[in-house]
Amino acid sequence: MSLISRLRAVVAGDDYLDGDYDDLDYDAGEHDDSPQAMASASSALAPLDAANPFDMDQGFSGSNVIGMPGISSSAAEVSLMEPRSFDEMPRAIQALRERKTVILNLTMMEPDQAQRAVDFVAGGTFAIDGHQERVGESIFLFAPSCVTVTNSAHEEASTPTVVTKDVEQASAEASVAPAPAWAAPGAAAL
């Protein structure tokens, strides 16, 4: 094929740019399309099909949704722990990883060990994007990210008047600009 005929074929949209496809010698051989040949071929493949655990025909339910581990459709589970030593804290982290809410009652621990335990579990809670809340004296609530924690007692204690007063004080302080530290006392008058 010459260059001009190839260009014409491209412009015309001819799918076969080369006429060489017809020149290839393929030995087509004989194909046996009889039902007996098809049955023997399928019986030869039958042991392979039975051994295939990923066969789509076996137990296909029509859904390809896979549940996340630790999430159940039942009610949320809360784990109450009253540890006596810091060695019990990995159980609290494991419960959080299983998406369980953990309430730690640290009244049985020494104050320095209790502080260490709270820091440890708070770090684990932060790592899984969870929430923490102090419930009472030495009692803490740690929740995974799938649980929403609201504190209604804290919301009732704050009043809008206090918030408004804080906003007014902040805006009054912001209107007075402090003098820069590099400016000399006499230079401000110039």
Curated annotation (Swiss-Prot):
Its main location: cytoplasm. InterPro entries: Cell_div_SepF, Cell_div_SepF/SepF-rel, SepF-like_sf. It comes from the Bacteria. GO terms for cellular component: cytoplasm. The keyword ATP-binding does not apply. Transmembrane segments: none annotated. One of its GO terms (biological process) is FtsZ-dependent cytokinesis. Keywords: Cell cycle, Cell division, Cytoplasm, Septation. It is found in: Cytoplasm. Pfam families: SepF (PF04472). Cell division protein that is part of the divisome complex and is recruited early to the Z-ring. Probably stimulates Z-ring formation, perhaps through the cross-linking of FtsZ protofilaments. Its function overlaps with FtsA. Belongs to the SepF family. Homodimer. Interacts with FtsZ. This is Cell division protein SepF. It comes from Synechococcus sp. (strain WH7803). The gene is sepF.
